[in-house]
Protein backbone atom coordinates (compact mmCIF):
# COMPACT_ATOMS: atom_id res chain seq x y z
CA UNK A 1 0.00 0.00 0.00
CA UNK A 2 1.32 3.44 -0.93
CA UNK A 3 1.90 6.06 1.75
CA UNK A 4 -1.05 8.33 2.52
CA UNK A 5 -1.82 11.55 4.36
CA UNK A 6 -4.88 12.16 6.53
CA UNK A 7 -6.22 15.73 6.63
CA UNK A 8 -8.68 17.04 9.21
CA UNK A 9 -9.20 20.33 11.12
CA UNK A 10 -7.29 20.78 14.39
CA UNK A 11 -10.52 20.93 16.43
CA UNK A 12 -13.95 19.52 15.58
CA UNK A 13 -16.90 20.45 17.80
CA UNK A 14 -19.90 18.13 17.54
CA UNK A 15 -23.39 17.86 19.04
CA UNK A 16 -26.05 20.07 20.60
CA UNK A 17 -24.58 23.20 22.13
CA UNK A 18 -21.25 22.89 20.33
CA UNK A 19 -21.59 26.34 18.75
CA UNK A 20 -21.38 28.16 22.08
CA UNK A 21 -18.47 25.98 23.21
CA UNK A 22 -16.53 26.65 20.01
CA UNK A 23 -16.91 30.42 20.38
CA UNK A 24 -15.97 30.31 24.08
CA UNK A 25 -12.83 28.40 23.16
CA UNK A 26 -11.69 31.44 21.14
CA UNK A 27 -11.01 33.16 24.45
CA UNK A 28 -7.30 33.90 24.60
CA UNK A 29 -6.79 33.19 20.90
CA UNK A 30 -5.68 36.74 20.21
CA UNK A 31 -8.20 37.25 17.41
CA UNK A 32 -9.68 40.75 17.28
CA UNK A 33 -11.74 41.08 14.09
CA UNK A 34 -13.69 38.31 12.40
CA UNK A 35 -15.19 38.28 8.93
CA UNK A 36 -18.42 36.25 9.00
CA UNK A 37 -19.11 34.79 5.56
CA UNK A 38 -22.71 33.66 5.12
CA UNK A 39 -25.82 34.17 3.01
CA UNK A 40 -28.82 36.47 3.14
CA UNK A 41 -31.12 33.82 4.64
CA UNK A 42 -28.77 33.17 7.55
CA UNK A 43 -28.51 36.89 8.15
CA UNK A 44 -32.25 37.56 8.01
CA UNK A 45 -33.02 34.56 10.21
CA UNK A 46 -30.85 35.95 12.99
CA UNK A 47 -28.21 33.22 13.03
CA UNK A 48 -25.47 35.61 11.88
CA UNK A 49 -26.37 37.97 14.75
CA UNK A 50 -26.34 35.03 17.14
CA UNK A 51 -22.75 34.27 16.15
CA UNK A 52 -21.74 37.94 16.20
CA UNK A 53 -23.18 38.34 19.70
CA UNK A 54 -21.30 35.26 20.91
CA UNK A 55 -18.09 36.70 19.46
CA UNK A 56 -18.66 39.93 21.38
CA UNK A 57 -18.68 37.98 24.65
CA UNK A 58 -15.09 37.01 23.83
CA UNK A 59 -14.08 40.55 22.91
CA UNK A 60 -14.07 39.89 19.17
CA UNK A 61 -15.58 42.33 16.69
CA UNK A 62 -17.07 41.14 13.42
CA UNK A 63 -17.94 42.30 9.93
CA UNK A 64 -20.40 40.40 7.74
CA UNK A 65 -20.41 39.36 4.10
CA UNK A 66 -23.80 37.79 3.37
CA UNK A 67 -23.69 37.83 -0.43
CA UNK A 68 -22.94 34.14 -0.92
CA UNK A 69 -25.31 32.32 -3.26
CA UNK A 70 -25.46 28.60 -4.10
CA UNK A 71 -22.46 27.74 -6.28
CA UNK A 72 -20.28 30.63 -5.00
CA UNK A 73 -18.53 32.66 -7.67
CA UNK A 74 -15.22 34.42 -8.14
CA UNK A 75 -17.13 37.69 -7.81
CA UNK A 76 -18.43 36.66 -4.38
CA UNK A 77 -14.90 35.84 -3.25
CA UNK A 78 -13.68 39.27 -4.35
CA UNK A 79 -16.58 41.02 -2.62
CA UNK A 80 -15.87 39.19 0.62
CA UNK A 81 -12.15 39.84 0.30
CA UNK A 82 -12.77 43.59 0.07
CA UNK A 83 -14.82 43.58 3.27
CA UNK A 84 -12.12 41.54 4.99
CA UNK A 85 -9.44 44.06 4.04
CA UNK A 86 -11.59 47.09 4.85
CA UNK A 87 -12.17 45.76 8.36
CA UNK A 88 -8.67 44.42 9.00
CA UNK A 89 -10.13 40.99 9.75
CA UNK A 90 -7.56 38.63 11.22
CA UNK A 91 -9.63 35.47 10.88
CA UNK A 92 -12.69 34.18 9.05
CA UNK A 93 -15.87 32.44 10.18
CA UNK A 94 -18.03 30.66 7.61
CA UNK A 95 -21.66 30.10 8.58
CA UNK A 96 -24.03 27.95 6.54
CA UNK A 97 -23.65 25.04 4.16
CA UNK A 98 -21.09 24.25 1.52
CA UNK A 99 -21.40 27.53 -0.38
CA UNK A 100 -20.44 29.89 2.48
CA UNK A 101 -17.70 27.48 3.57
CA UNK A 102 -16.18 27.30 0.09
CA UNK A 103 -16.42 31.05 -0.43
CA UNK A 104 -14.77 31.68 2.95
CA UNK A 105 -11.97 29.23 2.16
CA UNK A 106 -11.19 31.04 -1.07
CA UNK A 107 -11.30 34.43 0.67
CA UNK A 108 -8.93 33.22 3.40
CA UNK A 109 -6.56 31.66 0.86
CA UNK A 110 -6.32 34.65 -1.47
CA UNK A 111 -6.01 37.01 1.51
CA UNK A 112 -2.62 35.54 2.41
CA UNK A 113 -1.37 34.23 -0.94
CA UNK A 114 -2.49 37.04 -3.23
CA UNK A 115 -3.21 36.62 -6.92
CA UNK A 116 -6.51 35.41 -8.33
CA UNK A 117 -8.80 32.58 -7.28
CA UNK A 118 -8.11 30.68 -10.51
CA UNK A 119 -4.41 30.54 -9.61
CA UNK A 120 -5.25 27.88 -7.03
CA UNK A 121 -7.37 25.57 -9.18
CA UNK A 122 -5.99 22.06 -8.88
CA UNK A 123 -4.11 20.35 -6.07
CA UNK A 124 -1.99 22.20 -3.47
CA UNK A 125 -1.20 25.24 -5.61
CA UNK A 126 -0.83 27.71 -2.71
CA UNK A 127 2.44 28.41 -0.90
CA UNK A 128 1.21 30.02 2.32
CA UNK A 129 -1.37 29.03 4.94
CA UNK A 130 -4.74 30.74 4.61
CA UNK A 131 -6.09 33.04 7.30
CA UNK A 132 -7.42 30.97 10.23
CA UNK A 133 -10.94 29.75 9.51
CA UNK A 134 -13.72 28.50 11.78
CA UNK A 135 -16.49 26.79 9.80
CA UNK A 136 -19.90 26.59 11.46
CA UNK A 137 -22.10 24.11 9.62
CA UNK A 138 -25.88 24.36 9.22
CA UNK A 139 -26.48 21.52 6.74
CA UNK A 140 -25.73 17.80 6.81
CA UNK A 141 -24.13 17.06 3.50
CA UNK A 142 -21.17 18.83 1.94
CA UNK A 143 -18.73 18.40 4.85
CA UNK A 144 -16.95 21.47 3.49
CA UNK A 145 -16.61 22.64 7.09
CA UNK A 146 -13.82 20.10 7.57
CA UNK A 147 -12.27 19.43 4.16
CA UNK A 148 -9.42 20.70 1.98
CA UNK A 149 -11.85 20.99 -0.95
CA UNK A 150 -13.04 24.38 -2.17
CA UNK A 151 -15.34 24.66 -5.19
CA UNK A 152 -15.71 28.07 -6.81
CA UNK A 153 -17.63 28.88 -10.01
CA UNK A 154 -15.78 30.82 -12.68
CA UNK A 155 -18.71 32.72 -14.14
CA UNK A 156 -16.68 33.70 -17.22
CA UNK A 157 -15.83 30.14 -18.24
CA UNK A 158 -19.03 28.67 -16.75
CA UNK A 159 -17.07 25.99 -14.92
CA UNK A 160 -16.63 25.02 -11.31
CA UNK A 161 -13.01 25.19 -10.23
CA UNK A 162 -11.94 22.44 -7.85
CA UNK A 163 -9.37 23.82 -5.43
CA UNK A 164 -7.97 20.93 -3.41
CA UNK A 165 -5.47 22.46 -1.02
CA UNK A 166 -4.37 21.54 2.49
CA UNK A 167 -4.13 25.24 3.31
CA UNK A 168 -7.90 25.74 3.05
CA UNK A 169 -8.62 23.12 5.72
CA UNK A 170 -10.49 24.99 8.48
CA UNK A 171 -8.85 25.43 11.86
CA UNK A 172 -12.10 24.53 13.65
CA UNK A 173 -15.27 22.84 12.42
CA UNK A 174 -18.60 23.08 14.24
CA UNK A 175 -21.54 20.73 13.70
CA UNK A 176 -24.34 21.73 16.06
CA UNK A 177 -27.57 19.94 15.03
CA UNK A 178 -29.59 22.71 16.67
CA UNK A 179 -28.55 24.85 13.69
CA UNK A 180 -29.82 22.21 11.25
CA UNK A 181 -33.41 21.91 12.49
CA UNK A 182 -34.58 24.67 10.17
CA UNK A 183 -33.42 22.97 6.98
CA UNK A 184 -36.39 22.40 4.63
CA UNK A 185 -37.05 18.89 3.33
CA UNK A 186 -35.62 19.56 -0.13
CA UNK A 187 -32.33 20.84 1.24
CA UNK A 188 -32.15 18.00 3.77
CA UNK A 189 -32.63 15.50 0.93
CA UNK A 190 -30.10 17.10 -1.40
CA UNK A 191 -27.37 17.53 1.19
CA UNK A 192 -27.98 14.05 2.58
CA UNK A 193 -27.58 12.49 -0.86
CA UNK A 194 -24.42 14.55 -1.31
CA UNK A 195 -23.06 12.91 1.84
CA UNK A 196 -24.04 9.46 0.59
CA UNK A 197 -22.24 10.20 -2.67
CA UNK A 198 -19.14 11.13 -0.69
CA UNK A 199 -19.26 7.78 1.06
CA UNK A 200 -19.68 5.79 -2.15
CA UNK A 201 -17.03 7.67 -4.09
CA UNK A 202 -14.47 7.62 -1.28
CA UNK A 203 -14.97 3.89 -0.72
CA UNK A 204 -14.48 3.09 -4.41
CA UNK A 205 -11.68 5.63 -4.94
CA UNK A 206 -8.28 4.47 -6.13
CA UNK A 207 -6.83 6.38 -3.16
CA UNK A 208 -8.97 4.66 -0.50
CA UNK A 209 -7.26 3.47 2.69
CA UNK A 210 -8.44 1.35 5.64
CA UNK A 211 -9.14 4.57 7.56
CA UNK A 212 -11.24 6.16 4.81
CA UNK A 213 -13.00 2.84 4.23
CA UNK A 214 -14.12 2.68 7.87
CA UNK A 215 -15.40 6.25 7.74
CA UNK A 216 -17.24 5.72 4.45
CA UNK A 217 -19.01 2.53 5.52
CA UNK A 218 -20.15 3.96 8.85
CA UNK A 219 -21.39 7.08 7.08
CA UNK A 220 -23.40 5.04 4.58
CA UNK A 221 -24.93 3.02 7.40
CA UNK A 222 -26.03 6.10 9.34
CA UNK A 223 -27.36 7.90 6.26
CA UNK A 224 -29.44 4.89 5.20
CA UNK A 225 -30.98 4.73 8.67
CA UNK A 226 -31.60 8.43 9.25
CA UNK A 227 -31.91 10.48 6.05
CA UNK A 228 -35.56 9.76 5.30
CA UNK A 229 -36.51 10.40 8.93
CA UNK A 230 -34.70 13.74 8.88
CA UNK A 231 -36.51 14.63 5.65
CA UNK A 232 -39.93 13.62 6.97
CA UNK A 233 -39.51 15.30 10.36
CA UNK A 234 -36.86 17.97 10.53
CA UNK A 235 -37.34 18.37 14.28
CA UNK A 236 -36.34 14.77 14.98
CA UNK A 237 -33.14 15.58 16.89
CA UNK A 238 -31.72 12.04 16.99
CA UNK A 239 -31.99 11.87 13.19
CA UNK A 240 -30.52 15.36 12.77
CA UNK A 241 -27.61 14.56 15.05
CA UNK A 242 -27.01 11.23 13.32
CA UNK A 243 -26.92 12.97 9.93
CA UNK A 244 -24.48 15.55 11.30
CA UNK A 245 -22.12 12.79 12.36
CA UNK A 246 -22.70 10.81 9.16
CA UNK A 247 -21.87 13.67 6.83
CA UNK A 248 -18.76 14.41 8.90
CA UNK A 249 -17.63 10.79 8.60
CA UNK A 250 -18.23 10.89 4.86
CA UNK A 251 -16.20 14.09 4.78
CA UNK A 252 -13.32 12.38 6.58
CA UNK A 253 -13.48 9.69 3.93
CA UNK A 254 -13.47 11.79 0.78
CA UNK A 255 -11.20 14.50 2.19
CA UNK A 256 -8.47 11.89 2.21
CA UNK A 257 -9.48 9.39 -0.49
CA UNK A 258 -10.91 12.01 -2.87
CA UNK A 259 -13.93 11.40 -5.10
CA UNK A 260 -14.82 10.30 -8.63
CA UNK A 261 -16.90 10.87 -11.73
CA UNK A 262 -20.12 11.75 -9.89
CA UNK A 263 -18.55 14.89 -8.49
CA UNK A 264 -16.49 15.60 -11.60
CA UNK A 265 -19.69 15.57 -13.65
CA UNK A 266 -21.88 17.31 -11.08
CA UNK A 267 -19.44 20.21 -10.89
CA UNK A 268 -19.98 20.87 -14.59
CA UNK A 269 -23.77 20.82 -14.27
CA UNK A 270 -23.59 23.23 -11.36
CA UNK A 271 -21.15 25.55 -13.08
CA UNK A 272 -22.92 25.58 -16.45
CA UNK A 273 -26.57 25.68 -15.36
CA UNK A 274 -26.22 26.93 -11.75
CA UNK A 275 -27.94 23.79 -10.45
CA UNK A 276 -27.88 22.63 -6.80
CA UNK A 277 -24.84 20.45 -6.19
CA UNK A 278 -26.47 17.81 -4.00
CA UNK A 279 -29.32 17.24 -6.44
CA UNK A 280 -26.88 16.85 -9.35
CA UNK A 281 -24.93 14.27 -7.36
CA UNK A 282 -28.09 12.39 -6.43
CA UNK A 283 -29.28 12.16 -10.03
CA UNK A 284 -25.88 11.07 -11.36
CA UNK A 285 -24.93 8.67 -8.55
CA UNK A 286 -26.73 5.47 -9.67
CA UNK A 287 -25.52 5.91 -13.25
CA UNK A 288 -21.87 6.30 -12.26
CA UNK A 289 -22.15 3.41 -9.81
CA UNK A 290 -23.45 1.21 -12.63
CA UNK A 291 -20.55 2.35 -14.81
CA UNK A 292 -18.01 1.59 -12.07
CA UNK A 293 -19.57 -1.75 -11.13
CA UNK A 294 -17.53 -3.61 -13.73
CA UNK A 295 -14.38 -2.93 -11.68
CA UNK A 296 -15.62 -2.38 -8.09
CA UNK A 297 -18.75 -4.54 -7.77
CA UNK A 298 -17.50 -6.02 -4.51
CA UNK A 299 -16.96 -2.60 -3.03
CA UNK A 300 -20.43 -1.44 -4.03
CA UNK A 301 -21.86 -4.56 -2.41
CA UNK A 302 -19.93 -3.70 0.79
CA UNK A 303 -21.66 -0.33 0.93
CA UNK A 304 -25.02 -2.00 0.37
CA UNK A 305 -24.39 -4.32 3.30
CA UNK A 306 -23.48 -1.29 5.43
CA UNK A 307 -26.76 0.33 4.37
CA UNK A 308 -28.61 -2.65 5.83
CA UNK A 309 -29.43 -4.57 2.66
CA UNK A 310 -29.82 -8.35 2.97
CA UNK A 311 -27.29 -9.10 0.25
CA UNK A 312 -24.36 -10.69 2.09
CA UNK A 313 -24.98 -14.04 0.41
CA UNK A 314 -25.27 -12.62 -3.10
CA UNK A 315 -22.43 -12.52 -5.58
CA UNK A 316 -20.61 -9.25 -6.10
CA UNK A 317 -22.43 -8.42 -9.34
CA UNK A 318 -25.89 -9.10 -7.91
CA UNK A 319 -25.02 -7.33 -4.67
CA UNK A 320 -23.86 -4.25 -6.57
CA UNK A 321 -27.06 -4.21 -8.61
CA UNK A 322 -29.17 -4.42 -5.45
CA UNK A 323 -27.16 -1.60 -3.88
CA UNK A 324 -27.65 0.65 -6.90
CA UNK A 325 -31.39 -0.03 -6.83
CA UNK A 326 -31.47 0.85 -3.13
CA UNK A 327 -29.83 4.18 -3.94
CA UNK A 328 -32.50 4.86 -6.57
CA UNK A 329 -35.26 3.91 -4.13
CA UNK A 330 -33.89 6.14 -1.36
CA UNK A 331 -33.57 9.10 -3.72
CA UNK A 332 -37.12 8.65 -5.00
CA UNK A 333 -38.51 8.33 -1.47
CA UNK A 334 -37.18 11.76 -0.49
CA UNK A 335 -38.22 13.60 -3.63
CA UNK A 336 -35.02 13.73 -5.67
CA UNK A 337 -35.70 14.44 -9.39
CA UNK A 338 -35.54 11.35 -11.59
CA UNK A 339 -33.21 12.63 -14.32
CA UNK A 340 -31.25 15.52 -15.79
CA UNK A 341 -34.14 16.46 -18.05
CA UNK A 342 -36.12 17.47 -14.96
CA UNK A 343 -33.21 19.70 -13.94
CA UNK A 344 -33.23 21.52 -17.27
CA UNK A 345 -29.95 20.19 -18.64
CA UNK A 346 -29.63 19.91 -22.42
CA UNK A 347 -28.25 16.99 -24.38
CA UNK A 348 -26.55 19.27 -26.89
CA UNK A 349 -24.29 20.55 -24.09
CA UNK A 350 -23.05 17.08 -23.16
CA UNK A 351 -19.81 17.12 -25.22
CA UNK A 352 -18.66 20.29 -23.47
CA UNK A 353 -19.75 19.02 -20.05
CA UNK A 354 -17.90 15.74 -20.58
CA UNK A 355 -14.74 17.51 -21.71
CA UNK A 356 -14.70 19.67 -18.59
CA UNK A 357 -15.54 16.71 -16.33
CA UNK A 358 -12.51 14.78 -17.52
CA UNK A 359 -10.33 17.75 -16.52
CA UNK A 360 -11.83 18.00 -13.03
CA UNK A 361 -9.50 17.02 -10.18
CA UNK A 362 -12.14 14.66 -8.78
CA UNK A 363 -12.01 12.50 -11.91
CA UNK A 364 -8.47 11.35 -11.19
CA UNK A 365 -9.44 8.80 -8.52
CA UNK A 366 -12.50 7.28 -10.19
CA UNK A 367 -11.91 3.50 -10.22
CA UNK A 368 -12.77 3.17 -13.90
CA UNK A 369 -11.20 5.70 -16.22
CA UNK A 370 -13.14 6.60 -19.35
CA UNK A 371 -12.61 8.68 -22.44
CA UNK A 372 -14.64 11.53 -23.89
CA UNK A 373 -17.16 9.22 -25.56
CA UNK A 374 -17.75 7.15 -22.42
CA UNK A 375 -18.30 10.17 -20.21
CA UNK A 376 -20.68 11.63 -22.78
CA UNK A 377 -22.62 8.36 -22.67
CA UNK A 378 -22.65 8.53 -18.87
CA UNK A 379 -24.21 11.98 -18.99
CA UNK A 380 -26.75 10.88 -21.59
CA UNK A 381 -27.75 7.85 -19.51
CA UNK A 382 -28.94 10.26 -16.81
CA UNK A 383 -31.41 12.08 -19.09
From Swiss-Prot:
Q: Which residues form a coiled coil?
A: none
GO MF annotation terms: alcohol dehydrogenase (NAD+) activity; metal ion binding
SUPFAM superfamilies per record: Dehydroquinate synthase-like
Q: What is its EC number?
A: 1.1.1.1
Enzyme category, top tier = oxidoreductase
Q: Domain of life here?
A: Bacteria
Q: Which cofactor does it need?
A: Fe cation
Keyword Chloroplast applies: no
Catalytic activity field: a primary alcohol + NAD(+) = an aldehyde + NADH + H(+); a secondary alcohol + NAD(+) = a ketone + NADH + H(+)
Q: Which Pfam families match?
A: ADH_Fe_C, Fe-ADH
Keyword tags: Iron, NAD, Oxidoreductase
Query: Any additional notes?
Result: In Z.mobilis there are two isozymes of alcohol dehydrogenase.
Family label: Belongs to the iron-containing alcohol dehydrogenase family.
Task: Tell me how this protein assembles.
Answer: Homotetramer.
- Designated name of the protein: Alcohol dehydrogenase 2
**Organism expressing this protein natively:** Zymomonas mobilis subsp. mobilis (strain ATCC 10988 / DSM 424 / LMG 404 / NCIMB 8938 / NRRL B-806 / ZM1)
Q: What gene makes this protein?
A: adhB
Amino acid sequence: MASSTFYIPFVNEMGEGSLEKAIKDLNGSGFKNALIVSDAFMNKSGVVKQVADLLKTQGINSAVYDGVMPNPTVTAVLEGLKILKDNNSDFVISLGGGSPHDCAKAIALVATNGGEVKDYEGIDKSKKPALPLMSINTTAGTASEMTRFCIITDEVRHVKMAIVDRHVTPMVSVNDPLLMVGMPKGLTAATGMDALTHAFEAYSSTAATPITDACALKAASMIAKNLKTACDNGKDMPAREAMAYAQFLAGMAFNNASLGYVHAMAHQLGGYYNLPHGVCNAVLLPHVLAYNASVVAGRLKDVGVAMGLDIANLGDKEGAEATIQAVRDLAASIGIPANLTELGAKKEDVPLLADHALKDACALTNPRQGDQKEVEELFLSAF
